[in-house]
């Protein structure tokens, strides 16, 4: 895993949380509570969920990438790496 992916996920999370409806949608879709999100910020699965949330909503993905001054595909690629099969925390459905 790239440490940059974790940093990128945290920056993206900051962008998400700056907008209350978007933050509520993240919590609703991930099933996390605000306390649960805070407690799990160091976990790869949580960071992957943050980036996957963006990757699943193209308008948010593009807007977040613009705000972070990066290409949207960097966010999507980071999500893919964080979700990778090498992750011991990956939840298999």
Segments predicted by a language model, with ranges:
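Metal- and O2-centered redox machinery and metal/ROS homeostasis
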Residues: 1-93
């Amino acid at each position: 895993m790239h440490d940059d992916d974790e940093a990128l996920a945290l920056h993206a999370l900051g962008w998400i949380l700056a907008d209350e409806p978007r933050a509520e949608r993240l919590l609703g879709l991930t099933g996390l509570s605000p306390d649960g999100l805070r407690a799990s910020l160091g976990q790869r699965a949580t960071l992957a969920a943050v980036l996957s949330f963006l990757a699943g909503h193209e308008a948010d993905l593009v807007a977040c990438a613009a705000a972070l001054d990066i290409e949207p595909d960097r966010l999507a690629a980071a999500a893919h790496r964080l979700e990778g099969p090498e992750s011991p925390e990956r939840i298999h459905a």
